[in-house]
């Protein structure tokens, strides 16, 4: 059995069931906690970077400057993955699965968080549409007034999805929930998402400022004409099944993918 010691736990519950104190344990440093790793203990230490670079830039700079402080680095980050001791991990999960009738056109959901540039972009787009008819806007607060994913996805053909960072494979529940509810994402996010999911079922733009122009086209030509296009329908079904592995918790996927690798650290 793998044993972990978490250092400076910043997210309650991560590895909790895998963290009994043990003399023969892997030292896990994640996100901002990487600052506490010591070079002399590198053979027993791993770094797990879950939040994106836009949220914890200093942690990424630290690991990038000191990759030798860790036996292994687990991350989605394209730069850090260039190191020989780095391995990819994605903590995205599907929160909701439905195959309901699509009776509404376009939605967007945002919280009040404005900690990074793309948080601000999401809020700006939501504010632009809050008094317009083209998009149904859902405002929630992650701490006091959360919005259920079902509310803005289940019956919607399209939903605006802006990730918190732009990188090759930084994708989260934001787009995975779209795939699992057969909602087409109007997407700003992972630049290589097409290597994991069917791009014909994604309306991807490079910059969030392009979203209104795309919305105008969808509205002018009709959401149904896009959504029920045979090519789009085939891609929607394809992505619905491609996202199935993400219904497994990211921790279970992590242990499945890297359990044997970590066992060797303890032998």
Segments (PLM) and residue ranges:
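Pol beta-like nucleotidyltransferase catalytic core
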Residues: 1-49, 53, 59-161, 168-267
């Amino acid at each position: 059995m793998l044993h972990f010691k978490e250092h400076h736990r910043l997210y309650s519950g991560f590895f909790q069931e895998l963290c009994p104190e043990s003399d023969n344990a892997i030292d896990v440093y994640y996100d901002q906690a990487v600052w506490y790793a010591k070079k002399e203990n590198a053979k027993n230490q791993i770094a797990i970077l879950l939040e994106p670079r836009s949220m914890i830039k200093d942690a990424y700079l630290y690991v990038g400057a000191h990759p030798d402080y860790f036996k292994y680095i687990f991350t989605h980050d394209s730069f850090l993955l260039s190191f020989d001791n780095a391995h990819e991990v994605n903590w995205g999960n599907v929160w909701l699965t439905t195959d309901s009738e699509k009776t509404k056109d376009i939605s967007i959901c945002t919280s009040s968080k404005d900690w990074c540039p793309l948080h601000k972009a999401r809020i700006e787009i939501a504010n632009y549409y809050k008094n317009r008819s083209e998009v149904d806007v859902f405002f929630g607060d992650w701490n006091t007034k959360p919005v259920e994913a079902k509310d803005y996805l289940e019956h919607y053909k399209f939903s605006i999805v802006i990730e918190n960072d732009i990188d090759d494979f930084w994708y989260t529940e934001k787009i995975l929930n779209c795939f699992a509810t057969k909602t087409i994402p109007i997407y700003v996010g992972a630049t290589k998402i097409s290597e994991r999911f069917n791009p014909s079922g994604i309306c991807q733009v490079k910059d969030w400022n392009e979203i209104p122009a795309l919305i105008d086209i969808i509205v002018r030509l009709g959401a149904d004409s896009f959504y029920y296009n045979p090519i789009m329908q085939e891609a929607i079904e394809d992505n619905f099944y491609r996202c199935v592995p993400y219904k497994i918790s990211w921790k279970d996927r992590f242990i499945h993918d890297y359990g044997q690798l970590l066992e060797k650290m303890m032998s």
